[in-house]
Curated annotation (Swiss-Prot):
It comes from the Eukaryota. Residues 53-69 are annotated as: Framework-2. The gene is IGHV1-69-2. Residues 20-117 form the Ig-like domain. Keywords: Adaptive immunity, Cell membrane, Disulfide bond, Immunity, Immunoglobulin, Immunoglobulin domain, Membrane, Secreted, Signal. GO terms for molecular function: antigen binding. It is found in: Secreted; Cell membrane. Disulfide bonds join C41-C115. GO terms for biological process: immunoglobulin mediated immune response. Gene3D superfamilies: Immunoglobulins. Immunoglobulins are composed of two identical heavy chains and two identical light chains; disulfide-linked. This is Immunoglobulin heavy variable 1-69-2. V region of the variable domain of immunoglobulin heavy chains that participates in the antigen recognition. Immunoglobulins, also known as antibodies, are membrane-bound or secreted glycoproteins produced by B lymphocytes. In the recognition phase of humoral immunity, the membrane-bound immunoglobulins serve as receptors which, upon binding of a specific antigen, trigger the clonal expansion and differentiation of B lymphocytes into immunoglobulins-secreting plasma cells.
Length: 117
């Protein structure tokens, strides 16, 4: 029996109200500690490069925690100190998709992850 802790990463699908703005995220993931996960967020209904894309974590029973952002126009990123060195946020303007990669996963990374613009 595999007694290794597994990390459940849920990805919330978000929809906006401004002119049918939609942010569609990839599905739930189960990973082992130490692994890496990459979550996608495909947008429609607005010009992708006009707004920053943020990523937020919500652990069970906890509030929202901002992880970082990317400027899709130039790829510039800003990360929260807590996630610095473990998170990489990117944007692919050819597909209007943002990505959040979190490495060296820990049990406390079990959470719902949101993209937001």
């Amino acid at each position: 029996m595999d007694c290794t802790w597994r990390i459940l990463l849920l990805v919330a699908a978000a929809t906006g109200t401004h002119a049918e703005v939609q942010l569609v995220q990839s599905g739930a993931e189960v990973k082992k500690p130490g692994a890496t996960v990459k979550i996608s967020c495909k947008v429609s209904g607005y010009t992708f490069t006009d707004y920053y894309m943020h990523w937020v974590q919500q652990a069970p029973g906890k509030g929202l925690e901002w992880m970082g952002l990317v400027d899709p126009e130039d790829g510039e990123t800003i990360y929260a100190e807590k996630f610095q060195g473990r998170v990489t946020i990117t944007a692919d303007t050819s597909t209007d998709t943002a990505y959040m990669e979190l490495s060296s996963l820990r049990s406390e990374d079990t959470a719902v992850y949101y993209c937001a613009t």
